[in-house]
Swiss-Prot record:
One of its GO terms (molecular function) is L-ascorbic acid binding. Glycans are attached at N444, N544. It is found in: Endoplasmic reticulum; Sarcoplasmic reticulum; Golgi apparatus. The gene is P3h2. Fe cation binds at H575, D577, H647. This is Prolyl 3-hydroxylase 2. Residues 552-666 form the Fe2OG dioxygenase domain. The active site is at R657. It comes from Mus musculus (Mouse). Belongs to the leprecan family. Its cofactor is Fe cation; L-ascorbate.
Amino acid sequence: MRESTWVSLLLLLLLPTPQRGGPQDGRRSPEPEPERGPLQPFDLLYASGVAAYYSGDYERAVRDLEAALSSHRRLRDIRTRCARHCAARRPLAPPGAGPGAELPFFRAVLERARCSRSCQSQRLGGPASRHRVSEDVRSDFQRRVPYNYLQRAYIKLNQLEKAMEAAHTFFMANPEHMEMQQDLEDYKATARVEAPLLDREAKPHLESYNAGVKHYEADDFESAIKYFEQALREYFNEDMECRALCEGPQRFEEYEYLGYKGGLYEAIADHYMQVLVCQHECVRELATRPGRLSPIENFLPLHYDYLQFAYYRVGEYVKALECAKAYLMFHPDNEDVLDNVDFYESLLDDSTDPASIEAREDLTAFVKRHKLEAELIKLAAEGLGFSYAEPNYWISYGGRQDENRVPSGVNMDGAEVHGLSMGKKSPPKIGRDLREGGPLLYENITFVYNSEQLNGTQRVLLDNVLSQEQCRELHSVANGIMLVGDGYRGKTSPHTPNEKFEGATVLKALKFGYEGRVPLKSARLFYDISEKARKIVESYFMLNSTLYFSYTHMVCRTALSGQQDRRNDLSHPIHADNCLLDPEANECWKEPPAYTFRDYSALLYMNDDFDGGEFIFTEMDAKTVTASIKPKCGRMISFSSGGENPHGVKAVTRGQRCAVALWFTLDPLYRELERIQADEVIAILDQEQRGKHGLNINPKDEL
């Protein structure tokens, strides 16, 4: 593609998108909020709060965790306000013609960037870069993990009411968390509370929508209208916030591996396309309830579907017609609503021209922008060479199912059915022949169970992969090199606060061995046994292509004393390794943030001197256990990584459970970088070893 074409495409992509219509359009851009002092980074406050919790300083834990949550909310608000302020104050100029035609446009871009930096720095009390956090921290706040720590800290401080609020807030985003459910029941019984608990992170537009549905079903149409209209105002406000937050820094993971450095226009277009796709998918974000993977079907259109009939029932036929026409912007061929339009038009005064009644203004600009974005993404995908499948955001199978579906006197033929959730794709079936039963390659390894005996697909259980001596040696290495966390990002207790989670990578083990901090022989054993496991998996499942490491670490889970009473949570919740498990839909969606490139998984256990910690397979409902495996020294479980093998780990209630966890891929593009570096370290060590055993020749003898 010629450079001039790239310029045209880039300028087209960066043109300002249509703004939402409606009563708020005439408002001035939101002025930045007044000074309130430097904002402390929420990730540092969060880390401090968690550390205080584990040290038993519960007052400090509460203080820092509450401050972290407050900082997180304020940061989002500042970013949103600054984005809207600068978009209004520094509009992007359309490109002109002739030499340097793009310069005014890029000047406007630079001015907006300066405005954004100045606004955020002023409001934050320092550079915005201080508030960039890791994906792990961002994920914790999205999953409301801080509230799990908070409720426990409040209980320690005998503040039951606040503990209940925190527990309820966490549970709303983690409905599968059995221990929290039990805690909530116990709290309610103790406090004798019957009133609904407060969800501190409730989404206003979802709350208003739910209230509207309740009033609608109770035939209270005046109240239903009030809440649905409020829900729409809140929805569009949330949409603007979501879009503003998409404008932050982006990551180019696939390019990082290749050392890719694009030219000016390619780099800008690559970055902007990530922003645009993020903004385009805000409709899915806003339709998804906390803790769910599947969005509410047909969510935004349903507001207008409910409203068109509610307005009809209160005699406001013009508004009913506006809402019906708004619904048709999503589903222009919906026969029921087309009939409704004809019916509403027949009810208008003779002085009112039906053709003059148009679809709701608040939606017209929204849909126009959404369609324009879809066209731009498709155009850019063809030119930039990335894949993007436009989801059906407005799936129409999930319409209302009630006796008020169509007004009286209107044809009611044509049944509706519930169907697929919007924007979802079922994972493809495994694109290779499924075989098993190949040779185990090494002596002394004992075959225990195959897939059929484990009630599943592509599963195998083996014993004696490690000797007792090797288990003891690896356990010793683990205690010498492990960090609190997973070994890559140091994430403390990522799955449950009732256990300490520690991990280490192969590369770190070799580094410690090379520095003499652990025996080099023991560090080398970690490397060697992981390679042994890879060869066994590749051979047993009779794979026709090379199996590569995609992720390797040694991991120990330790039960925390004083926190094991009444435990019924899992050490590691039920999940799949290469797709997002959706128990409600009985599906596993092979899409980011899942590690979609993983093909096989293996766990090699080091010990059995602990209570609990059984590895379990389940059905896709994440509840029906199909197999349970008790870890012990030298035992290895391996399986394919997809939705056919949901699995988890039961709570470790006493002692420490250690294992080597391995994930493999058939795609060399996704080879584990640390493993490649570890291979290089091993090559250097082998070369040094060969040098030590070489002939000791006096250089003078060679003369």
